[in-house]
């Protein structure tokens, strides 16, 4: 049995339950022309984000991670929801947010990993093709992100 089979993801477009620990905050960042920036790592397209540090808010975590990994400034950040991750007896949340791209600076080395990540702006309506999530929860999250972005940004 693969490790992935032991992990269950469920998408909730709700406020986070207080007792549920948050292990990551990731975001979908939109440009003014309805594109989304994706991080490219080892030939795979991914969202950007990471672990909250030093009692950061979700917004602070997302802004820091986008600077560290892609050197992109964000603004107009909205909470989207969370993925409930059930891994054996462990339960935790992966928070998802949306944001507008404020400024894109030259690529640089991520201080946390020592890597320089690729980045690409892709049409928002093609994001599922690039991320290629196998699970329903990830695809539901993308649908909700696109809807919230249309309501708030476009």
What residue spans do the PLM features occupy?
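A short, compositionally biased N-terminal segment around positions ~18-40 that is enriched
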Residues: 19-32, 143-148
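Short glycine-enriched loop/turn motifs at secondary-structure junctions
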Residues: 21, 45-46, 110-115
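Short, contiguous, helix-prone interaction/anchoring segments in small proteins
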Residues: 25-46
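A short local loop/turn or secondary-structure capping micro-motif enriched for an aromatic residue
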Residues: 45-48, 55
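Unchanged
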Residues: 52-75, 80-136
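Charged phosphate-binding loop/patch that engages nucleotide di/tri-phosphates or the phosphate backbone
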Residues: 133-154
């Amino acid at each position: 049995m693969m490790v992935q089979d032991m992990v269950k993801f469920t998408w909730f477009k709700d406020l986070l339950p207080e007792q549920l620990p948050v292990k990551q905050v990731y975001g979908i960042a939109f440009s003014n022309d309805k594109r989304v920036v994706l991080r490219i790592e080892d030939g795979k397209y991914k969202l950007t984000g990471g672990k909250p540090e030093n009692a950061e808010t979700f917004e602070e975590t997302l802004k820091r991670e986008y600077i560290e990994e892609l050197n992109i400034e964000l603004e107009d950040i909205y909470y989207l929801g969370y993925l409930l991750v059930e891994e054996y007896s462990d339960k935790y949340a992966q928070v998802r947010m949306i944001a507008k791209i404020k400024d894109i600076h030259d690529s640089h080395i991520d201080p946390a990993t020592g890597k320089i990540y690729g980045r690409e702006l892709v049409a928002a309506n093609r994001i599922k093709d690039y991320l290629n999530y196998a699970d329903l929860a990830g695809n539901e999250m993308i649908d909700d992100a696109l809807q919230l972005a249309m309501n708030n940004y476009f």
